[in-house]
């Protein structure tokens, strides 16, 4: 058995999708489903087909009814024996009414329906083979071709259409009645003739209405479709006075103008009243300012400082406004720039730290005797002394002579340099400022002094003091002398005693004042 052709597939699905229940998705009800579940023989939309794919092919096998062309006859039979209607009725019969996809297709009803579709499709495949249609397949009746609707006929009432049809039938009788009427008019000599009563012999009511209509409008049946124009609902105006209508319209316009004018007047009155209230508030505020003697710049300053009286709720006034003065900020005095040193940080640090021990004993002992003064003055003096001690560093003059650059007086700008170096191609700063001769003299003096030595060092060349080895430091060179340490300890003891006395006095005064 070969596979069905693409044309066979399209033909089968065209007829299956013509069934009304197959025009919507089986799960969500979306229109025009283009996917199908072969396992259940139902039509699905693209969103629900994705949910079925996540279930797995053992529960639902999905294919497209438009894109896939490799359908087998067994799969087509599954779709023919199934359908949305049969699947929905089967699920309802077995009590499965949930909308959850996992719960629905993992239920007992879904398992039974899968087995049923599989058995029916197998039987249909064996019985019909490659036939397109099955005996049990429901074929929808072919709908008649749509007729072209007449615009006028759709807007005409059924009664009028029936009368028009009856008028076309009764036209010969009306034509035969006309010669009788003309002969009667000739015989009676111009007397008025009433309507014809020959139509009363007709037993039906419709023909009576037709005869009356024909008398009023004898040309209606001849005009065909044009005769129906009078039945669109238009009515002829009778006994209408246009002057009265015009007067009513003018009266309505006048009423509208009066209402608009009243609205404008009321709006202007509200604006005027609000302005009056604003002026009253302003006058009250000005009177308050006059009472408080605030005017000009003081008023602005008081508002800026948060002492304005316009936003205050209380009537209490501040006395600060009477003595308010404007303080103008003077230009700040620039602080003197600190000295910048390019010295060695290590040398300056150790020199400044050791300056305390280099001071005489009298100066150090005098610091401890200052406890007899008042506490405030003592702390100020001690703070200033400590600051001076810490900030005291070696200046430019404390550097050794060998490492210090010599100070030279600037050479006056004269013509001597031009005369001296006029023909020289290149000169140095030492040659220009006259430092070359002095440097040469110092170098020659050092070399003559060290000429007898077998080896020299940089310290010998630049006449720097030699550094002691790390192992040659003694305790006496590091620590101060013994008398100094004794005096230092004695000063510390005296300071500690005075501190304890001072602390006891403070605690006693606090207890006396606030209570223990």
Curated annotation (Swiss-Prot):
Coiled coil in keyword set: yes
Topological type in the membrane: Peripheral membrane protein
GO cellular component terms, semicolon-separated: cytosol; Golgi apparatus; Golgi membrane; membrane
SUPFAM superfamilies the UniProt entry points to: ArfGap/RecO-like zinc finger
Ranges annotated as biased composition (Polar residues): 173-194
Modified residues (Phosphoserine): 231, 270, 274, 331, 370, 428, 451, 453, 455, 457-458
InterPro entries: ARFGAP/RecO (IPR037278), ArfGAP_dom (IPR001164), ArfGAP_dom_sf (IPR038508)
GO molecular function: GTPase activator activity; zinc ion binding
Annotated GO biological process: COPI coating of Golgi vesicle; intracellular protein transport; protein secretion; vesicle-mediated transport
Location(s) in or outside the cell: Cytoplasm; Golgi apparatus membrane
Keywords per UniProt: Coiled coil, Cytoplasm, ER-Golgi transport, Golgi apparatus, GTPase activation, Membrane, Metal-binding, Phosphoprotein, Protein transport, Transport, Zinc, Zinc-finger
Coiled coil ranges: 243-263
Stated role: GTPase-activating protein (GAP) for ADP ribosylation factor 1 (ARF1). Hydrolysis of ARF1-bound GTP may lead to dissociation of coatomer from Golgi-derived membranes to allow fusion with target membranes.
Designated name of the protein: ADP-ribosylation factor GTPase-activating protein 3
């Amino acid at each position: 058995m070969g596979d069905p052709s693409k044309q066979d597939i399209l033909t089968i699905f065209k007829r299956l999708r013509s069934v009304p229940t197959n025009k919507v998705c089986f799960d969500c009800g979306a229109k025009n489903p283009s996917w199908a579940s072969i396992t259940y023989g139902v039509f699905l939309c693209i969103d629900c087909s994705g949910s079925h794919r996540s279930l797995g092919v053992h529960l639902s096998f999905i294919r497209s009814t438009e894109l896939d062309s490799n359908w087998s006859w067994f799969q087509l039979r599954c779709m023919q024996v199934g359908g949305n209607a049969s699947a929905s009725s089967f699920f309802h019969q077995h009590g499965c009414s949930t909308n959850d996809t996992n719960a629905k297709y993992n239920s007992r009803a879904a398992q039974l329906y899968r087995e049923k579709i599989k058995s029916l499709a197998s039987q249909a495949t064996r019985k019909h083979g490659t036939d397109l249609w099955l005996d049990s397949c429901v074929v929808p009746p072919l709908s008649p071709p749509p007729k072209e609707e007449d615009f006028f006929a759709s807007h005409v009432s059924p009664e009028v259409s029936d009368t028009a049809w009856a008028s076309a039938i009764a036209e010969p009788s009306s034509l035969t009645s006309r010669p009788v009427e003309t002969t009667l008019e000739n015989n009676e000599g111009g007397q008025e003739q009433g309507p014809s009563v020959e139509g009363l012999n007709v037993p039906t009511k419709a023909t009576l209405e037709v005869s009356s209509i024909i008398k009023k409008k004898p040309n209606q049946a001849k005009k065909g479709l044009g005769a129906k124009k009078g039945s669109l609902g238009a009515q002829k105006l009778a006994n209408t006075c246009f002057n009265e209508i015009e007067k009513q319209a003018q009266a309505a316009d006048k009423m509208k103008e009066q209402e608009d004018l009243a609205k404008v007047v009321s709006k202007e009155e509200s604006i005027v009243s609000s302005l009056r209230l604003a002026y009253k508030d302003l006058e009250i505020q000005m009177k308050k300012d006059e009472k408080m003697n605030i005017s000009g710049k003081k008023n602005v300053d008081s508002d800026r400082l948060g002492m304005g009286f316009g936003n205050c709720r209380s009537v209490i006034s501040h006395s600060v406004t009477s003595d308010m003065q404007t303080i103008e900020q003077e230009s700040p005095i620039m602080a003197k720039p600190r000295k910048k040193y390019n010295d060695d940080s290590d040398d300056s640090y150790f020199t400044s730290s050791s300056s305390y021990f280099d001071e005489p004993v009298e100066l150090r002992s005098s610091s401890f005797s200052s406890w007899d003064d008042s506490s405030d003055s003592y702390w100020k003096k001690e703070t200033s002394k400590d600051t001076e001690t810490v900030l005291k560093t070696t200046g430019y003059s404390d550097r050794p002579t060998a490492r210090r650059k010599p100070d030279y007086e600037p050479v006056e700008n004269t013509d001597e340099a031009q005369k001296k170096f006029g023909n020289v191609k290149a000169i140095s700063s030492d040659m220009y400022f006259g430092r070359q001769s002095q440097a040469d003299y110092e170098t020659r003096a050092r070399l003559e002094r060290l000429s007898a030595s077998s080896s020299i060092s940089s310290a010998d060349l630049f006449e720097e003091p030699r550094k002691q080895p790390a192992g040659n430091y003694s305790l006496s060179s590091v620590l101060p002398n013994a008398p100094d340490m004794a005096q230092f300890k004695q000063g510390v003891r005296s300071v500690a005693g005075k501190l304890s006395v001072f602390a006891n006095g403070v605690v006693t005064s606090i207890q006396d004042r606030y209570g223990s």
